[in-house]
UniProtKB/Swiss-Prot annotation:
One of its GO terms (biological process) is translation. Belongs to the bacterial ribosomal protein bL20 family. One of its GO terms (molecular function) is rRNA binding. CDD domains: Ribosomal_L20. One of its GO terms (cellular component) is ribonucleoprotein complex. Keywords: Ribonucleoprotein, Ribosomal protein, RNA-binding, rRNA-binding. Binds directly to 23S ribosomal RNA and is necessary for the in vitro assembly process of the 50S ribosomal subunit. It is not involved in the protein synthesizing functions of that subunit. InterPro entries: Ribosomal_bL20, RIBOSOMAL_L20_CS, Ribosomal_protein_bL20_C. PANTHER family: 39S RIBOSOMAL PROTEIN L20 (PTHR10986). The lineage of its organism: Bacteria, Pseudomonadati, Pseudomonadota, Gammaproteobacteria, Thiotrichales. The keyword Nucleotide-binding does not apply. The keyword Ribosomal protein applies. This is Large ribosomal subunit protein bL20.
Length: 118
């Protein structure tokens, strides 16, 4: 068997990690050992935050719906309860879009919910 020198593969691996660490501060973008740790941690944060992003957006939509609903003298929970009773199946993302960009349509939805609660 012939001898395998690993300089080429090591250089390629180091280059790959250092390219992934571009833009990092100080040694994190220059020193392989530090950069490798930084890249691994960045990947962990990215994985975690892809999951958290869904929760964050849902809470943002709820805040927006609640703020718009209270302008029509109804709380968020009452609005959702009323919509469920009527059978309106608008998700929170769609309701938030209506609340921000189409106030007339949102007002109509609120009136339906109020009618169901009365």
């Amino acid at each position: 068997m012939s001898r395998v020198k690993r300089g080429v593969t090591a250089r390629a691996r180091h280059k790959k990690v250092l390219n992934q660490a571009k833009g990092y501060y100080g040694a994190r973008s220059r020193v392989y050992r530090v950069a490798k740790q930084a890249v691994i941690k960045a990947g962990q944060y990215a994985y975690r935050d892809r999951k958290v992003k869904k929760r964050t957006f849902r809470s943002l939509w709820i805040v927006r719906i609640n703020a718009a609903a209270r302008q029509h003298d109804i709380s968020y929970s009452q609005l959702i309860n009323g919509l469920n009773k009527v059978g309106v199946e608008l998700d929170r993302k769609a309701l938030a879009e209506l609340a921000v960009y189409n106030k007339d349509a949102f007002a109509a939805v609120v009136e339906k919910a109020k009618a169901a609660l009365a």
